[in-house]
């Protein structure tokens, strides 16, 4: 009777736990959405031009002075939109890379995208005189040739070339994760070496413009660049979310995923290509922004688990939150100008990443210590019991 009751109530208990987990996940997602909205609102009021909250509200509804309206609508709003879109895109791309390669150290730049984009931008600025420095203090105070998109276009072309080259090489070895990582490191080193040679022969102005371009700067964003990034990120997000159950199957291993009907090689090729294109677009317009694609997937997986139906939207929201925080910090810490947001994300990300590594090591040591202590205690108890039994029998 007791066994029958246990078998009857056990499925109900599991359903209750699943419902509780689902509600917790929904609560965290709602909290992330609120965080994005609040931080985006705060970012509108932070900047080098000191405006009161009332003046910002007036400019937001186009009731302030012409200069204030121009600052809010032409500078700050495109910047906030870029932070939300780029943060989401880089974070989701990092999550997809980590899933495909089964490597927690993987990032959106694993395929050498950032290195190739930097080379393309340097080639445009140095070799084709694509940029010259202005006398302003802002990080984005240089103009890129006659067409402001020339350098971004060149950066995107070389980033895409790097993606296709690495994925083409990896198809020869059936997309083994180790081969992908090693190929990315090798090709990335080639792009870095080529960039160094270009900078060696550059003029002072060209070198300064090239180095400034590599700084991650949301101040370059315009409504047009935001629209391009939004379209690419949205297409990638929809594709990844539709394929979320296949990514969940991939977590069980290639053999298990294939037994469930997943075309593993095709999934890896398509998803890594799309994740790299998202990264290439963001880097081409905004420069190098590191650690977003590593930190945020780790945070969401620790909070919400590995189910991609939850972790994909959660990673997107957490990436937006991180980049909004970094952008706000860069404008608050800069003396009259914004610091490179890429430097802020690295300063925030490096200690966090080290903390994850050390916590994992300490947790592993603690587990071994507890297991060893339990085995010793078990051995002592067994030996004591044997002595007691032997004493009674004698």
How would you describe each model-predicted region?
Residues 2-374, 387, 394:
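Alpha-helical transmembrane segments in inner-membrane proteins
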